């Protein structure tokens, strides 16, 4: 049995299938874990969603910002943008079944010694705290008041963690850390404006670049940051978003041996 973690799929269904064939993925014996953003921007989000759901217990995922965006649109609290490619899902006969299934997933998964998140874990949280805070958001997603969560999900403030935060501000910041973060200060103040670079001006650094971050001894697998192109980010860090949606390959990581496999459809 092999556990595979795949980076951002974003509706690139053909590349996903090609990649799984390349590693000889067998859903009867292997597991596929997605590091978030399985939908949006690519041409086949509906096919991707249906396929992942069809894998049953052989599939797990953490939610990314695009997955949450789809759910917010479906709830009627957000309108699609011109860049979104979610129309087919929203109009599908099985839309509600797919959306309900998607909404059940967490923001953080532990698979053996590996922790999978979409964007990262801020430097001021250790793994135990991250797990507890991820569960707070998951509880909101699973509650009958989940529409309230989506109504207040969007926004860049507050931008720094304070344990006394409550309500929608608290949930928004936790969600932003797990699904949108790239750069932050040493104490975790977010810069959500800088999206396309791999460097930032003082006092900001990549979240994983802070040497004293409290999760440094944990093996963290993440996606989200296509500009990194899957670069080596340091010990215990595994970046899987290789920018498939932008013309790069799609990447999968074998958790049994930490080997990467990339796949790209030739033009």
What is the predicted role of each segment?
Residues 46-49, 54-169:
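Active-site neighborhood of divalent metal-dependent phosphoester bond hydrolases
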